[in-house]
Amino acid sequence: MLRLALTGVTGRMGRAVLELAASAPDIQLVCGLIRPARDPHEVAAQLPAPLALTSRVAELVQGADVVVDFSHPAVTVAVAEAAAHAGIPLVSGTTGLSEHDQAVILRAAQHVPVVQAANFSLGIALLHWLLPELVARLPTWDVELIERHHRHKRDAPSGTALALARTLLAAREPAPSPLVYGRGPGTAPRQPGEVGIHAVRAGGEVGRHTVLLATDDEAIEVTHWVQSRRAYAQGALEAARRLIGRPPGLYSLQDLVT
């Protein structure tokens, strides 16, 4: 039985993971993290499944086999340090991390296995495998990336879009131009090798990422469309299962599933 601790239990992703984990026969929910100002009884009454709650990170990791984190950068940093100190693997999907925050994650990965992904969809993991193949075979084609999310999403471009862009850039030979964010008034003509990235925020879109490869004569569009946050939750729980027993290090989701 996999004993799982969870952050961000009142957020969209935390609730999705909680609901799915509660119905999984191989997972035991041991603890959830809430903000100190919140009343644990009030929060517990609003959750989709029973869960012991704490506002103390040190208590969160006690008795857990793995921590799944979908929270805020400041929380992620504290959880990463606590997990490393306790020797507990960490699955983190928090985005918007600073360079300092990422350095803390890297230090934690020296002591415990850490899987970090901006998107825990298994389809996105496979897209990271597919895109380099396309770009390598079509080296002169223009590449643009368009991502769409709900109106409430704060970071733009999304962490997933940035990760996909890095995958595309790494597959480009020779060395590509930098990323181009949007194409507003006064934008210079497209340069060979560059990758354009565009963010759309509207409605209730859970997440859609489209990679466009084009010449003057033809084009290919590859689109991944998430219809439910359960897709992310399923990927995060699968990552937690596969992380157990791995040596310390920083893993991507595609490291675990491809």
From Swiss-Prot:
Please name the pathway: Amino-acid biosynthesis; L-lysine biosynthesis via DAP pathway; (S)-tetrahydrodipicolinate from L-aspartate: step 4/4
Which enzyme type, at the first EC level? Answer: oxidoreductase
GO terms of molecular function: 4-hydroxy-tetrahydrodipicolinate reductase; NAD binding; NADP binding; oxidoreductase activity, acting on CH or CH2 groups, NAD or NADP as acceptor
InterPro entries per record: DapB_C, DapB_N, DapB_N_CS, DHDPR_bac, NAD(P)-bd_dom_sf
Active site at 149 (proton donor/acceptor), 153 (proton donor)
Q: Which PROSITE patterns match?
A: DAPB
Write down the chemical reaction(s) this protein catalyses.
Answer: (S)-2,3,4,5-tetrahydrodipicolinate + NAD(+) + H2O = (2S,4S)-4-hydroxy-2,3,4,5-tetrahydrodipicolinate + NADH + H(+); (S)-2,3,4,5-tetrahydrodipicolinate + NADP(+) + H2O = (2S,4S)-4-hydroxy-2,3,4,5-tetrahydrodipicolinate + NADPH + H(+)
Give the residues the record marks as binding (S)-2,3,4,5-tetrahydrodipicolinate.
150, 159-160
Specify which residues bind NAD(+) according to the UniProt entry for this protein.
Answer: 8-13, 93-95, 117-120
Q: What is its EC number?
A: 1.17.1.8
Which GO cellular component terms, listed alphabetically, does the Swiss-Prot or TrEMBL entry include? cytoplasm
The record's principal subcellular location, in a coarse class, is cytoplasm
A biological process (GO) of this protein is:
diaminopimelate biosynthetic process
Arranged from A to Z, the UniProt key words for this protein are: Amino-acid biosynthesis, Cytoplasm, Diaminopimelate biosynthesis, Lysine biosynthesis, NAD, NADP, Oxidoreductase
What Pfam families does UniProt report for this protein, alphabetically?
DapB_C, DapB_N
Spell out the subcellular localization from the entry.
Cytoplasm
Question: Domain of life here?
Answer: Bacteria
Its biological purpose is as follows: Catalyzes the conversion of 4-hydroxy-tetrahydrodipicolinate (HTPA) to tetrahydrodipicolinate.
Q: NCBIfam families per the record?
A: dapB
Q: Please state which protein family the record places this protein in.
A: Belongs to the DapB family.
Q: Mind telling me what this protein is named?
A: 4-hydroxy-tetrahydrodipicolinate reductase
Q: Which organism is it from?
A: Thermomicrobium roseum (strain ATCC 27502 / DSM 5159 / P-2)
Gene giving rise to this polypeptide: dapB
